[in-house]
Amino acid sequence: MKLHHRMLRHFIAASVIVLTSSFLIFELVASDRAMSAYLRYIVQKADSSFLYDKYQNQSIAAHVMRALAAEQSEVSPEQRRAICEAFESANNTHGLNLTAHKYPGLRGTLQTASTDCDTIVEAAALLPAFDQAVEGNRHQDDYGSGLGMAEEKFHYYLDLNDRYVYFYEPVNVEYFAMNNWSFLQSGSIGIDRKDIEKVFTGRTVLSSIYQDQRTKQNVMSLLTPVYVAGQLKGIVLLDINKNNLRNIFYTHDRPLLWRFLNVTLTDTDSGRDIIINQSEDNLFQYVSYVHDLPGGIRVSLSIDILYFITSSWKSVLFWILTALILLNMVRMHFRLYQNVSRENISDAMTGLYNRKILTPELEQRLQKLVQSGSSVMFIAIDMDKLKQINDTLGHQEGDLAITLLAQAIKQSIRKSDYAIRLGGDEFCIILVDSTPQIAAQLPERIEKRLQHIAPQKEIGFSSGIYAMKENDTLHDAYKASDERLYVNKQNKNSRS
């Protein structure tokens, strides 16, 4: 296939790919916009969920403050005795329900620094109010469209005055014991001191990400102050861990998306993060969204490209099939064109070029080569005694002799050269960028090829060689080589 035809084929094939890809790109852009909006919705829903948790924590704190502010009845001797009988010490910590649920009056575990059970009697009598508040908030009706999910977050209460901590869920002291009771000092419970100090403003605080001493995992906490008579008494805390965050960010309406969604919370101050979810394959991201929450928490979401392929497989399959069909049509068209072109300029009997190859375009190309200093050699070839072969052996044998000579010529030249059957037993060879020496050796090389492919045949030929000059036409060059052929043939006949 000629260079310009090959370039045209590549151009059309590239155009087909571009045009069919534009449909896929349009789908990708539309999906990008839709999924970007959906990621914003996920973050807004998570932000609302944090507000809902904040409201619940404030509700629990308010319930505790009402219980503390109410007039307290004196603890009965029986209740005091039950509390002190259940009071235990383990792992350098003291309190109730440390290793087993020995005091049924409390649902969870109370840990204190004091070795005297009398110091926690009043607390043990008041903490059921905390249990009731947590239980009530967990089971209240959800009017927030999924914001108040039925899950068990970790609630606990720190009393700053009496130095005890009460966990709503039982905590085995063998696995975690509160040993540093200086709550307001940095590092005592893992929460940054700046976050604890913000509690003194009276607001509920969402802490930065820190490593929880109990679970050794990165968590966040909501801290709500508890006041009595205008003085800060304690803090109600709600831990938000990775599992809680997975429930908050989980795409319930698009479960397939969760397989390809990356969700990370990062603390912009400390650099700590919580990797909530990771794509199963994570090929590369095609949609991403970043949003900063109050308190220096950055939410980063991204969707892997495999989600688009999986969710839009019909569009992708349609694009692939359309592109393949159109590319195959282009290939078949150019193959047909190549076959037709080859048949148009090829000699049916020998497979060499025919006269139609001698076009003005070829003439201009050869003239440019000559003008640039390259040598173009014309060799005219004519079979000897073809009429005698036809008369004695038949035209079929004569055609065979022509075919064998054409085969020998074709095997003796380069692909860049032109071997042309002008008609009958007349041939013309055009050697491009050759030399007179090479041209002079070509007839001998053709004779050797004839002897090799047809050793039993006596096929002879005569030739004439001419070097094309500037301003020579194809007709001029061939005529000059043909005249030399005639001279050489006359000389050969006179010798025989």
From Swiss-Prot:
Pathway: Purine metabolism; 3',5'-cyclic di-GMP biosynthesis
Textual note on the cofactor: Binds 1 Mg(2+) ion per monomer.
Keyword Cell inner membrane: yes
Induction: Expressed during exponential and post-exponential growth, it is slightly more highly expressed at 37 than 28 degrees Celsius and is more highly induced on solid medium.
Catalysis: reaction(s): 2 GTP = 3',3'-c-di-GMP + 2 diphosphate
Bilayer disposition of the protein: Multi-pass membrane protein
Principal location: membrane
Superkingdom of the organism of origin: Bacteria
Result of knocking out the encoding gene: Deletion of the gene increases swimming motility. Disruption of this gene partially suppresses the reduced motility of a pdeH disruption. Full suppression i.e. wild-type motility, requires concomitant disruption of dgcJ, dgcE and dgcQ.
Sequence positions that bind Mg(2+): 382, 425
GO terms under biological process: cell adhesion involved in single-species biofilm formation; negative regulation of bacterial-type flagellum-dependent cell motility
Keywords, ordered alphabetically: Cell inner membrane, Cell membrane, GTP-binding, Magnesium, Membrane, Metal-binding, Nucleotide-binding, Transferase, Transmembrane, Transmembrane helix
EC number(s) per entry: 2.7.7.65
InterPro entries in UniProt: DgcJ_diguan (IPR049828), Diguanylate_Cyclase (IPR050469), GAPES1 (IPR033420), GGDEF_dom (IPR000160), Nucleotide_cyclase (IPR029787), Rev_trsase/Diguanyl_cyclase (IPR043128)
Site (Transition state stabilizer): 387
SMART domains: GGDEF (SM00267)
Annotated residues for binding of substrate: 390, 395, 399
Active-site positions on this chain: 425
Protein name: Probable diguanylate cyclase DgcJ
